[in-house]
Amino acid sequence: MEFVIKQSVLKEELGFVQGIVEKKSTIPVLSNILIESIGEGTIRIVGTDLDVTIRCEAEADIKQPGAMCIQARKLFDIVRLLDAGDVHFAKEENEWVKMTCGKSKFRLAGVSKENFPEVPSFKNAPLKLSAEIFNHFIQNTAFAITNEQSRFTLSGAKFIIADATARMVTTDGHRLAFIEKKLGENSATTDMDALIPKKALLELVKISRDSNGEVSFGEDPNHIYFEVDGRLLITRKLSGTFPNYEMVIPKDNDKTAVFDADEMKTAIRRVSLMADERTRSVRLTIRPNEIEIGAQSSEEGEASEKVAADYQGDEVTIGFNSQYLQDFLNVVGAAAAEAPETEKETDGETVRVKENAGRPRISFEFKDGSAQTQMRVAGDSAYNYKYIVMPLRI
């Protein structure tokens, strides 16, 4: 095999597969990527860890068709340091690959294509959803996925499409993130209900973050396929039964306090410095017109801070893991900063403004100090987004 490709093009596509390729694996070939020619002017780059696979395509001048397998990390480290221009690849005997760019020359050890895992064949993708919606779903839910590998069914997101509505739910057993959005009549033609691994979700964000188009996706009994801008991500489904999340969403929280998300986030960050290192617990005392955040450590001291809130009712104190609150407030703030712009007429002039412009305010809905609390963005009509947290004993 022999081909020539632009350094900038190769660097971009190699960057997408780095998060998939195993750097240290009991199966050595998984540290490699497969590069093969397709037709006269395209190469295909494939990386896999057997659970998640990414396949990219890039324009190249194919001198001789074929395939090569090269160590992924080493190749990426070399390519990103090369000068801009053409990079020439030529496969030699015994799977060695000669690589030149300007005055730079490299000779890389490769492995046979026959040793590379077979990539699942891509099925037709009957469903489409805008990349913006997919990224918003993942950004607002992925943080609540458990990091405990033993809790297999909680190590991904439940993704549902039914009744012209898309929904994503995640939980680690202590908190739950739920988001849904009504779709247009022509957005989905088939229902779906699947568990998607966290790693696949995060890689999907990477390959679709800068896309203004749609993500096409479909499934077979074992895999889910996502395609965006010519890049394909294939992931194994998680097996098992996801918890009945509808039972967790509170139905009788009769008290609501509304506060500024940024003010609360900053206050919790400061006060939590004095929280117990093991539980990270802070207490929120909700009173008319304010919420007081407090934390204490028997060994280090204590701290408190007040945040203004729209609330009229009896005083209630609730304990929380401070990190759970910060995770939610962080993604709400990030979503507001990245909100899309729309054109509006003002005094006869067309101006571009952010949707939901301004500092986000949080609706904090609770019943008492022992029942789960629900938080959502006040006034958000684009998405039905809920975050439910179990309280701590204080």
Where do the PLM segments sit?
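Structural preference for solvent-exposed beta-strand-turn elements
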Residues: 1-394
